[in-house]
């Protein structure tokens, strides 16, 4: 019994060493910074495209503002009022753009989705790229069907709220509790979908669930920690004044991408490590074994910071 426990502890420690080596090799913080930069450039265009899709359907009138407020209040900790005001101002300015400018907004939105696709496929060591037509169809589907699904869920929520059964105290209390858990459920579902669907290779559901759970827990802890830091140490307001929302948003987006990529690294490394353990005969797993595994997987330091060049 004691030997089994020691063996499992060795396996767990070996996996952590392998994961650490993988994260260092992939330069996760550099990739997160790149993704944060692309996100900030594409955030307003993406939201504008999503809102414009919703505005084409009268049944979803007003849903765009509700989605925007919900996302900011539940996924941007602290200073949400300042961030929301800045985003609304930026988005309102896009209404003055010409057709050519609107086309550039769409291109910027696709650029963000393409960057996510490229970064995650690099983590999974996918060398075979999707066909351009397939990729374009996938991005188009995300930008069109995504807003419709969100709008439909909001409409369904409003309908359920208006039902007479909601007057019952027990049902109403359960419904409010469910709504309180909704942000956590949505973030977990988004992580699972991201880790299952984006890589251009088969990913085991159990691995995606573990990676999504890890990323979801980190995300919730980060929201609390970041909010505490912002409220307890508001030096950013003294330094930046009215522009304080910009660095707050940038730091938070950067932190979010670190969490997303850590979850992806966990999901991808589970498959590699599990396959390696299957062929391992000896019960003594040492650091030298991890070095051999990392060399086998090609985890050798590279001077390049571009995923496409590795």
Swiss-Prot record:
Keywords: Cell inner membrane, Cell membrane, Membrane, Transmembrane, Transmembrane helix. GO terms for cellular component: plasma membrane. The lineage of its organism: Bacteria, Pseudomonadati, Pseudomonadota, Gammaproteobacteria, Vibrionales. The chain crosses the membrane at residues 34-54, 97-117, 136-156, 178-198, 207-227, 242-262. The keyword Cell inner membrane applies. It is found in: Cell inner membrane. It is a multi-pass membrane protein. It comes from the Bacteria. Belongs to the UPF0761 family. PANTHER family: INNER MEMBRANE PROTEIN YHJD, UPF0761 MEMBRANE PROTEIN YIHY. NCBIfam families: PRK01637.1, yihY_not_rbn. This is UPF0761 membrane protein VF_0100. InterPro entries: UPF0761_bac, Virul_fac_BrkB.
